[in-house]
């Protein structure tokens, strides 16, 4: 099983950017934790981070046929990008949306997600653990989907 992990804009600044909201772990450290869990689960992960909407869309499109699912933290694009939402819908892979902070406890403009309607689930508010919970959920979902199709 192959999972693409997509990190959206400004997540490259984790560890220094608003640590009271996003925590002190760097993106590299979060990726290490995701990799360790993936190994434990018996799946492989690849990572992609960009501050560019178009580059994120390209990565999502390239996942079609190469990956079994997508774990995505679209960051600010959660609330603005119909294009990323449409790319996720187009590839028709299982998607889990994750957020470090609880977007529903923050500013009103952060409460709406364009991604949620095309995701199998959303996990928010658990810091870096949101990624680990998301990977476990996606792994379980894909395994059940494989069994159902068999």
Curated annotation (Swiss-Prot):
Top-level taxon = Bacteria
- Signal peptide bounds: none
Question: Which HAMAP family does this one have?
Answer: AroQ (MF_00169)
Official protein name in the record: 3-dehydroquinate dehydratase
Task performed by this protein: Catalyzes a trans-dehydration via an enolate intermediate.
Species classification: Bacteria, Pseudomonadati, Thermodesulfobacteriota, Desulfuromonadia, Geobacterales
**Could you tell me the Gene Ontology terms of the biological process aspect for this record?**
amino acid biosynthetic process; aromatic amino acid family biosynthetic process; chorismate biosynthetic process; quinate catabolic process
Protein family = Belongs to the type-II 3-dehydroquinase family.
Q: Where is the active site?
A: 22 (proton acceptor), 99 (proton donor)
- Pathway info: Metabolic intermediate biosynthesis; chorismate biosynthesis; chorismate from D-erythrose 4-phosphate and phosphoenolpyruvate: step 3/7
Look up the EC number in the record and give it: 4.2.1.10
InterPro entries the UniProt entry points to: DHquinase_II (IPR001874), DHquinase_II_CS (IPR018509), DHquinase_II_sf (IPR036441)
What are the residue positions of the site described as Transition state stabilizer? 17
Binding annotation for substrate: 73, 79, 86, 100-101, 110
Which keywords has UniProt assigned to this entry?
Amino-acid biosynthesis, Aromatic amino acid biosynthesis, Lyase
* Subunit annotation: Homododecamer.
